[in-house]
Amino acid sequence: KENSLEFVAYAMQTGADALEVDVRMGENGILILSHDKTDEDAVRLADVFRMMGKYPGMRINCDLKECGLEVAVRQLALISGLKTEQILYSGSVRPVPVTESCIWRDVEVFWNIEEYLPDIYKEQKEDLLFEQAAYKISRACRKYGIHTVNVNEKIATEEFIRVTGENDIDLSVWTVNDEERFRELLGQGVKNITTRNVKMACEVRSCEKSS
């Protein structure tokens, strides 16, 4: 079950580069793992961060499920003994322009494209629309000092990948469980691929590195 301690412990032992968890603020002011608002007991993010201390080579993608958590999550990570390079943000992130000060700028952001282009997933799949979106998000990334955009795999067309690449913007693509599609995106230079098929992903990555 995702967002459970059992899932976290399993993911940490798979050899994956990063673990993704859903983060929100509980009613008692404690950061928890939960996709939706809940009254039930949930895993505390502090417990997960403590577990992460045993895996210094692994990163944790905190998928923020509500706005305004950037400072609190960073502070908790530091208190828990993690380096800021070990955490990254996706989800409901509100980026700050590079011309302004930002206490959490040292945390890498995988910026969800719908945070800037809210109608992107309502559009019909047309290469021209996605190409235009790639130019728009690339310009916005420069404004906010962001280097990686997080998109659903249906948006990761050849044109979208080409345009973002030409603008020095990396891609994080979700959720790719099909091996053929995984290999295709890897071959196109996609920086990060989120998958539930961790065994397949690790095997493909291992083959790529040894070849």
Regions found by a protein language model. Name each.
Residues K1-S211:
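Phosphate-group recognition and catalysis centered on beta-loop-alpha active-site segments
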